[in-house]
Swiss-Prot record:
Binds ribosomal protein uS19. The PRC barrel domain binds ribosomal protein uS19. The lineage of its organism: Bacteria, Bacillati, Bacillota, Clostridia, Eubacteriales. Belongs to the RimM family. InterPro entries: PRC_barrel-like_sf (IPR011033), PRC_RimM (IPR056792), RimM (IPR011961), RimM_N (IPR002676), RimM_N_sf (IPR036976), Transl_B-barrel_sf (IPR009000). An accessory protein needed during the final step in the assembly of 30S ribosomal subunit, possibly for assembly of the head region. Essential for efficient processing of 16S rRNA. May be needed both before and after RbfA during the maturation of 16S rRNA. It has affinity for free ribosomal 30S subunits but not for 70S ribosomes. GO terms for cellular component: cytoplasm; ribosome. This is Ribosome maturation factor RimM. The gene is rimM. Gene3D superfamilies: PRC-barrel domain (2.30.30.240), RimM (2.40.30.60). It is found in: Cytoplasm. It comes from Clostridium kluyveri (strain ATCC 8527 / DSM 555 / NBRC 12016 / NCIMB 10680 / K1). PANTHER family: RIBOSOME MATURATION FACTOR RIMM.
Length: 162
């Protein structure tokens, strides 16, 4: 498992004093209010201000005091260390831990690896890429077991879903 969890991407500057507009990559934008620091390209940066704006976050980071300096960060990702990440309930996983998992069914048939997790209103959907591409609903009666340590997800055989 990775040591860092990506929580957002800097998409632009905000204002003239070095604030950063961030696209959140977390399911709860309010988590940004609790952050004291983030890593940008492996370097720890202290957060001195946070505002929520629609579906974006405006962050003020120590040492970034001008629009010119802020522009240097455009496109970069914000990460938190795994030990400082939010604690998940049992049966919930970070997307970073799901992407790349092998997907097999109960009979051992290999379907491919998860390339992306798509969020929908009802449930997440796993996009599997192998010999073919397959979208799998991340629901209890399809996904039987998730083992992020083994990087393996076991599902019911596709033909039994109907």
């Amino acid at each position: 498992m990775k040591d860092f969890i990506t929580v957002g991407q800097i998409i632009n500057t905000h204002g003239l004093k070095g604030e950063l507009k961030v696209y959140p990559l977390t399911d709860d934008i309010n988590r940004f209010k609790e952050l004291k620091s983030v890593y940008v390209e492996g370097i720890l940066k202290n957060i001195t201000g946070c505002k929520l704006q629609s579906k974006k976050v405006i962050l003020k980071i120590e040492g970034i005091d001008s629009i010119e300096k802020a522009l240097e960060y455009k496109g970069k990702y914000l990460e938190v260390s795994r030990e400082n990440a939010v604690k998940l309930e049992e049966g919930r996983y970070f997307i970073v831990d799901i992407v790349g998992c092998r997907v097999i069914d109960e009979e051992g048939v290999f379907y491919g690896k998860i390339s992306e997790v798509i969020h929908t209103h009802r449930n997440d959907v796993y996009w599997i890429k192998g010999d073919n591409e397959l979208l799998i609903p991340a629901i209890e009666n399809v996904v039987l077991k998730v083992d992020v340590e083994k990087q393996e997800i076991i599902i019911k055989p596709v033909e039994t879903w109907m």
